Regions:
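Short, Lys/Arg-enriched N-terminal segments with co-localized hydrophobic residues
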Residues: 2-18
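Glycine-rich phosphate- or other oxyanion-binding loops that anchor nucleotides, phosphorylated ligands
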Residues: 73-110, 118, 164, 171-172
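Short catalytic-loop micro-motif centered on adjacent basic/acidic residues
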Residues: 24-25, 78, 105, 131, ...
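N-terminal glycine-rich anion-binding loop in soluble enzyme alpha/beta folds
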Residues: 22-86
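Short beta-strand->loop
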Residues: 107-109, 132-135
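An N-terminal domain-start capping segment
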Residues: 14-21, 90-94, 107-113, 191-197
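Mixed-charge interfacial surface used for oligomerization/domain docking
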Residues: 29-43, 48-50, 102, 115-130, ...
């Protein structure tokens, strides 16, 4: 079972068990846990969250602390991507500890944050660093990273061009949709207007947000209780997106009821989908989706 990151500092696992000359890198917004990063040999660079007058590394504190602060003050948390300095440290440390290695950085959607731009500035002109926009976030980015990491473990002799080709194929096929747990976070952060927020509250509407070409797009609105709309999404989303049945990941925000999680797994298993794990949202996604969010990630056939 996949669980959230619990450490915000730069995590450099080295070559892991693969001994590949290619080392992967991603941001904490991918919601890859320290344990999984170690298994896959992925370096995690922290993104940042500002609340209570302090900017902190994503993953360095529990997401509940952020939720409690917002509940008490109504001051929305703000998120920011990795800085050029973050990548100077990350690239430098990885290459120093792994002489002769190459880095493949699979970036959090460049449409949503400055992280990739920061990395490009630092890596400019370097042939030992390759940067690819995953055009996804959270577990969508994680799924792409996992696919490349497993390919490298199976074929450690793989070239950087070959690994990049696998990444691009995965990026073209990955699909992600989620339902925010609390629209108040989207409204407070300026992601939805007050009018749209009030209308949704009055009518009991829950928007489905899909990641399309790196952008977060509201594609549909469900009506009813959170339990009802999540069950409906679980029935509709995988088939509507022609997801492969052998690899589905489920996303949940802190506070999503265990009974809802069990119901969703039952629905998907009845349809023949293999749930590979639950991914709990870290602070970057949770700052916008709030507690109790739900999402589905998979690869199109």
């Amino acid at each position: 079972m996949l669980t959230p990151s619990t450490a915000g500092a730069l995590r450099v696992p080295g070559r892991g068990n693969t001994m590949s000359k290619i080392l992967l890198m991603a941001e904490s917004g991918s919601d890859i846990t320290p344990e999984l990063a170690g298994q896959l040999g992925v370096t995690i660079v922290p993104m940042h969250v500002t609340f209570a007058g302090e900017t902190r590394d994503d993953g360095a504190f529990p997401v509940t602390q952020m939720f409690e602060h917002y509940k008490a003050t109504r001051e929305p948390p703000r998120t920011s991507g990795c800085t050029p300095h973050d990548f100077e440290v990350a690239f430098g440390r990885v290459l120093e500890e792994n002489p002769g290695a190459q880095i493949l950085y699979l970036a959090y959607s460049a449409c949503t944050t400055c992280s990739m731009q920061s990395a490009v500035m630092v890596a400019d002109g370097r042939e030992d660093i390759r940067i690819i926009d995953t055009k996804s976030v959270s577990a969508g980015q994680m799924a792409v990273v996992m696919r490349v990491a497993k390919a490298l473990q199976a074929h450690p002799e793989m070239t950087l061009d070959e690994a990049a080709a696998i990444a691009k194929d995965a990026i073209a096929k990955v699909r992600m949709g989620f339902i925010p747990g609390d629209l108040d976070y989207l409204r407070a952060g300026g992601r939805v207007s007050n009018a749209a927020y009030l209308g949704a509250k009055i009518l009991g509407l829950h928007p489905l947000i899909e990641v399309q070409d790196g952008k977060l797009i509201s594609t549909k609105k469900y009506r009813g209780s959170m339990a009802r709309v999540i069950a409906q999404m679980a029935r509709e989303y995988p088939e509507a997106n022609a997801l492969r049945k052998d690899e589905v990941y489920l996303i949940y925000g802190e506070g999503l009821a265990q009974s809802i999680r069990q119901e969703v797994e039952g629905i998907l298993q009845e349809k023949g989908y293999a749930v590979r794990g639950w991914v709990r949202t870290g602070c970057v996604i949770a700052a916008h989706s709030g507690p109790g969010s739900f999402g589905i990630v998979g690869f199109a056939e």
